[in-house]
């Protein structure tokens, strides 16, 4: 029924019903979902993001190859020189692959393993400026002395759980600093 959320039954008159959603995978037709139910569905299965329109989601830009390592589950801790804001602890955050390779990637592999460096550069060319997937970050740990991480700054460790890689990354999206929002 048009104007009624398919999941919870709320209507457009109810304040939680604020968006119309498009052509969706679950039944190959347009459906109405309220913001709350659509957000919950995407947090459960981020691959449904392609069929939702009008919602904002948090995104973190990460240099390659670390962005891909996060969404594939190889990287268990994200290191930042700032604490994860409380409102994002335990929330699904999309991971955006930045345009450039991280400077430490070149420093660590340029002399010892040129092949690994060339693979990393090719990956950065193919998988940059796009949302690759999402993760859930836990409570920040720290601050720790940055010398341990090769930096003069204090560093925080963000534990990573529940990585999900999108089958079809969202391409050609310029990144931003810190956590930013994207609207679908």
Model-identified regions with their sequence ranges:
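Conserved long hydrophobic alpha-helices within structured protein cores
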Residues: 1-11, 92-97, 101
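Short recognition patches in nucleic-acid-associated and regulatory proteins
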Residues: 2-28
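Extracellular interaction modules
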Residues: 27-33, 155
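Short, intrinsically disordered terminal segments enriched in charged and Pro/Gly residues
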Residues: 30, 40-46
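Generic secondary-structure boundary signal with a strong preference for alpha-helix termini
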Residues: 19-21, 34, 85
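Structured alpha/beta reader/binder surfaces that contact nucleic acids or chromatin modification marks
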Residues: 46-184
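Cys/His-rich microdomains that often coordinate metals
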Residues: 12, 33, 41
């Amino acid at each position: 029924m048009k104007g009624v959320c398919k999941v919870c039954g709320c209507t457009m008159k109810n304040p939680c019903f604020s968006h119309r959603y498009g052509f969706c995978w679950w039944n190959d037709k347009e459906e109405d979902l309220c913001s709350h139910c659509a957000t919950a569905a995407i947090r459960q299965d981020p691959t449904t993001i392609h069929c939702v329109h009008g919602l904002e989601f948090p995104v973190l830009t990460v240099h390659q190859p670390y962005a891909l390592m996060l969404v594939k589950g190889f990287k268990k801790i994200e290191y930042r020189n700032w604490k994860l804001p409380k409102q994002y602890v335990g929330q699904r955050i999309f991971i955006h692959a930045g345009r450039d390779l991280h400077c430490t990637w070149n420093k660590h592999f340029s002399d010892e393993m040129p092949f690994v460096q060339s693979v990393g550069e090719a990956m950065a060319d193919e998988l940059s400026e796009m949302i690759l997937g999402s993760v859930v970050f836990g409570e920040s740990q720290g601050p720790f002395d940055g010398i341990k991480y090769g930096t003069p700054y204090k560093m925080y460790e963000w534990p990573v759980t529940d990585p999900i890689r999108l089958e079809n990354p969202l391409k050609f999206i310029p990144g931003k600093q810190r956590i930013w929002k994207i609207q679908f």
